[in-house]
Amino acid sequence: MSGALDVLQMKEEDVLKFLAAGTHLGGTNLDFQMEQYIYKRKSDGIYIINLKRTWEKLLLAARAIVAIENPADVSVISSRNTGQRAVLKFAAATGATPIAGRFTPGTFTNQIQAAFREPRLLVVTDPRADHQPLTEASYVNLPTIALCNTDSPLRYVDIAIPCNNKGAHSVGLMWWMLAREVLRMRGTISREHPWEVMPDLYFYRDPEEIEKEEQAAAEKAVTKEEFQGEWTAPAPEFTATQPEVADWSEGVQVPSVPIQQFPTEDWSAQPATEDWSAAPTAQATEWVGATTDWS
């Protein structure tokens, strides 16, 4: 499909992206029309998709999209959550018309309703989930392109791109690859330089996970501010005020306290001694008399 041109050959970095996103991993069931895109079967029953065939059908789908003169005549649809963000990003990059979410029955066939449109090409994410637009496309002779897994029915599908259309990373990467090839074939971007848009922008993210991440980031920021506030708070300034003394020789005036005068005794005088041989006093004899009678 690449026409033996080195420019259109699959690069090693593209193969690494496919393997990292799990694009080559199919399901455990196999549709008979998808057998031509299968490389091998693993021991656990999972079929492995041939990435060479995936790349060839991707280039064919990009050529079909580029062949439409008005980009708005290309309708890209995804009713599953994993492909809605990728569809909107693809439409913003290539100018296609996105239908993300529920497809209103009769959009391609009922001319009375306000949502009626007549596209020239239809690209869907999952033939099983997007069966209603595929069926209506068959009524109005509308060519269709679909991302098909190993168990996807190929009824009403004109160009099937074999890949893993269940994983969020695989679906986002396939839409990113398709948008990049469309822009390269239009000449909008060069093949010599990598596309500045990252595949992460096409990945589906659960709103609950995003809310949890934002809450965790906010709590982390608050904790960081509190931690920094405890250690980086400015220390209180202590300014010791020194009394102003004009003449340091004068010093500080100390209040005078009157000195109490105590009488002085003559230590050289002979102290008065008592006569120890004198008779005891009457009080002492009373105690002696009271204590000697033990009988």
Swiss-Prot record:
Outcome recorded upon mutating L58F: In ICAS; reduced protein levels
Q: Which residues carry this modification: Phosphoserine?
A: S43
Q: Name one GO biological process term.
A: translation
Output the PROSITE patterns linked to this UniProt entry. RIBOSOMAL_S2_1, RIBOSOMAL_S2_2
Q: Where along the sequence does the record put site: Cleavage?
A: A115, F116, P133, L134
Cross-referenced InterPro entries: Ribosomal_uS2, Ribosomal_uS2_C, Ribosomal_uS2_CS, Ribosomal_uS2_euk, Ribosomal_uS2_euk/arc, Ribosomal_uS2_flav_dom_sf, Ribosomal_uS2_vert
Q: Where is this region: Disordered?
A: 266-295
> Where do the record's region annotations for Laminin-binding lie?
161-180, 205-229, 242-295
Q: Does the keyword Cell membrane apply?
A: yes
Which GO cellular component terms, listed alphabetically, does the Swiss-Prot or TrEMBL entry include?
cytoplasm; cytosol; cytosolic ribosome; cytosolic small ribosomal subunit; extracellular exosome; membrane; nucleoplasm; nucleus
Residues bearing PTM N-acetylserine: S2
Which superkingdom does the taxonomy of this entry point to?
Eukaryota
Span list, region Interaction with PPP1R16B = 54-113
Q: Which UniProt keywords apply?
A: Acetylation, Cell membrane, Cytoplasm, Disease variant, Host cell receptor for virus entry, Host-virus interaction, Isopeptide bond, Membrane, Nucleus, Phosphoprotein, Receptor, Repeat, Ribonucleoprotein, Ribosomal protein, Ubl conjugation
Q: Which regions are annotated as [DE]-W-[ST] repeats?
A: 230-232, 247-249, 266-268, 275-277, 293-295
Q: Which CDD domains match?
A: RPS2 (cd01425)
Q: Which GO terms describe its molecular function?
A: DNA binding; laminin binding; laminin receptor activity; ribosome binding; RNA binding; structural constituent of ribosome; virus receptor activity
Q: What does the subunit comment say?
A: Monomer (37LRP) and homodimer (67LR). Component of the small ribosomal subunit. Mature ribosomes consist of a small (40S) and a large (60S) subunit. The 40S subunit contains about 33 different proteins and 1 molecule of RNA (18S). The 60S subunit contains about 49 different proteins and 3 molecules of RNA (28S, 5.8S and 5S). Interacts with RPS21. Interacts with several laminins including at least LAMB1. Interacts with MDK. The mature dimeric form interacts with PPP1R16B (via its fourth ankyrin repeat). Interacts with PPP1CA only in the presence of PPP1R16B. (Microbial infection) 67LR interacts with capsid protein of Adeno-associated virus 2,3,8 and 9.
Q: What disease does the Swiss-Prot or TrEMBL record associate with this chain?
A: Asplenia, isolated congenital: A rare primary immunodeficiency and life-threatening condition, often presenting with pneumococcal sepsis. Most affected individuals die of severe bacterial infections in early childhood. Isolated asplenia is distinct from asplenia associated with other complex visceral defects, notably heterotaxy syndromes such as Ivemark syndrome.
Explain the purpose of this protein.
Required for the assembly and/or stability of the 40S ribosomal subunit. Required for the processing of the 20S rRNA-precursor to mature 18S rRNA in a late step of the maturation of 40S ribosomal subunits. Also functions as a cell surface receptor for laminin. Plays a role in cell adhesion to the basement membrane and in the consequent activation of signaling transduction pathways. May play a role in cell fate determination and tissue morphogenesis. Acts as a PPP1R16B-dependent substrate of PPP1CA.
- Per its record, how is this protein called by name? Small ribosomal subunit protein uS2
